[in-house]
Design a protein with these regions (language model features):
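Charged, compositionally biased, marginally structured helical/coil segments
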Residues: 1-144
Length: 144
């Protein structure tokens, strides 16, 4: 998802008066603007995906706290917010696809350690997989 795509969605959310989408997009656009200032230039698409993932993680944590505090109003609000944020992310790889990708990387690079496999996986499929699952699968394949 590019910055211009996000801004177009933001404009559409303003026009349709969709408060949750607007709130989520404003948070992401603000994070992108801060990163742009930090980088002193445009933010690459890979970094935008990472920023959206951070927002998703933050929203999940807030949702967990709301559930622990039994705050029904906040739970509903953050579930909607989380759904909007997750819709901005690229499609996640299934466990089978991830397994195939790791096998291909091991075959191509001949890697025997976890580090090189995870590095190659990150370069090729950044933001499209769960790191814990990938790490567990890679360990399993390398020790087998």
């Amino acid at each position: 998802m590019t910055e211009s795509d996000l801004r177009e969605r933001l404009t559409a959310a303003m026009r349709s008066k969709d408060a949750m989408t607007l709130r989520a997009l404003r948070a992401v656009v603000a994070a992108i603007k801060n990163k742009s200032i930090e980088l002193r230039g445009p933010v690459p698409e890979r970094e935008i995906t990472a920023l959206i993932q951070r927002e998703v993680k933050q929203c999940r944590e807030t949702l967990d706290f709301a559930r622990k505090a039994d705050r029904a109003d906040q739970i509903a609000e953050h579930e909607q917010l989380l759904a909007v944020l997750e819709s901005l992310l690229p499609a996640a790889m299934s466990e089978g696809e991830l397994r195939e990708a790791i096998q291909a990387i091991v075959a191509e690079t001949g890697a025997t350690g976890l580090g090189p496999v995870m590095k190659a996986l990150g370069e090729r499929y950044a933001g499209r997989y769960d790191g814990k699952t990938a790490s567990a699968l890679a360990r399993e394949m390398l020790t087998a």
